[in-house]
Regions:
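Class I S-adenosyl-L-methionine
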Residues: 4-14, 26-193, 199
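Short glycine-/small-residue-rich Rossmann-like dinucleotide-binding loops
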Residues: 22
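SAM cofactor-binding core of SAM-dependent methyltransferases
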Residues: 1
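C-terminal target-recognition/interaction regions appended to catalytic cores
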Residues: 158-316
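Non-cysteine beta-strand/loop elements that form the S-adenosyl-L-methionine
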Residues: 18-19
Length: 316
């Protein structure tokens, strides 16, 4: 990224910069190493802001950066530097399930508006206007065919085996009941956060009988059984109706359009999906920033042909 910084010099009249600097160095799912090179990229983001001086910016990152005491000095320095550049900065933690995303995924958003914006309402309250009750996993996946067929063509063949020494929690959807990091998916609720590490035995698990035949979730029965008698846990293959979540299913749970195409290997596709900000969540935040820039509640924003997304929304 340092090699392209000079190309930003002289760019003017930028409306908005949107980005999510790589977060593995801050994530509880990663090594949480402040010296991780990827952790330094938040400062590259600040440098981009200082060079192009947009009217507004949106930065997304993992919840840990916003909450953990370990990252407090980083957090305070980040906000201080952005404010020093002349921005009114708001910092918030949002849950994707509040924004029409069938996933319990919490992330921080740092939103900055150039100049003094004391008259701007509370951001979280503003964004709640775009809040919609999310569909369940079952409801969201109804748009797809069965795994391996039609518009859901991919499959993940990583074997699913039960752990002989499971890590038990009160919920069957927490802990570690299987070998590997893939956890069972709550079909009639929200998915857990889809990680960038998906692929192989780190891919979430789907109960096909529950999803397609409305059977009771097998994992609940099994969890109850070994909670009562842990000796019943054994290393063995899981029932055949348990399988890994497909690329297409993961994309739907991140609210990508069904026709959206990902490039690269299957492993790369899982990573792209897990790293992404859920589309509906991004829309809610970006739309509100556009409102502020336009000074109006109705939004009509037509990006150029080079933009990936076309926002055209109006509040009812």
């Amino acid at each position: 990224i340092n090699s392209v910084m000079d190309r930003l010099d002289g760019i003017e009249n930028v409306d908005m910069v949107i980005g999510g600097p790589p977060c593995q160095g801050f994530s509880v799912a990663g090594k949480m190493d402040v010296n991780d090179k990827r952790s330094q990229l938040i400062w590259s983001y600040v440098k981009v802001i200082s060079k192009v001086k947009p009217k507004a910016f949106i930065m997304e990152n993992v919840k840990a950066l916003g909450l953990l005491e370990k990252w407090k000095p980083i957090r305070e320095k980040l906000l201080s530097e952005l404010r020093h550049l002349g921005y009114t900065v708001n910092f918030m933690i949002l849950n994707a399930s509040d924004y029409d995303v069938p996933q319990a995924r919490e992330r921080i958003f740092v939103v900055g508006i150039k100049g003094n914006c004391n008259n701007v309402p509370n951001w979280e309250e503003m964004i709640k206007h775009y809040s919609h009750k999310a569909p369940t996993v079952r409801e969201a996946l109804q748009v797809l065919d069965k795994a391996g067929h039609g518009n859901n063509p991919s499959t993940c063949r990583a074997k699913i085996t039960l752990a002989s020494n499971p890590i038990l929690r009160k919920s069957p959807y927490a802990g570690m009941l299987f070998n590997g990091l893939g956890r069972p998916t709550r079909i009639d609720g929200y998915s857990a956060t889809l990680p960038a590490s998906m692929g192989g035995n780190k891919t979430p698990i789907i109960d096909e009988k529950e999803l397609y035949e409305n059977c009771a979730p097998w994992i609940v029965t099994y969890h109850d059984e070994i909670m009562k008698d842990p000796s019943k846990a054994a290393f063995k293959e899981a029932p055949s109706f348990l399988r890994r979540m497909t690329v297409e299913e993961a994309a739907i749970l991140q609210t990508f359009p069904i026709e959206y195409e990902f490039c690269g290997s299957q492993s790369s596709k899982y990573t792209q999906i897990g790293n992404a900000v859920p589309c509906n969540m991004a829309k809610a935040v970006a739309t509100r920033v556009i409102n502020v820039l336009n000074g109006e509640e109705n939004v009509i924003f037509k990006p150029t042909e080079h933009n990936l997304f076309d926002f055209s929304y109006a509040e009812s």
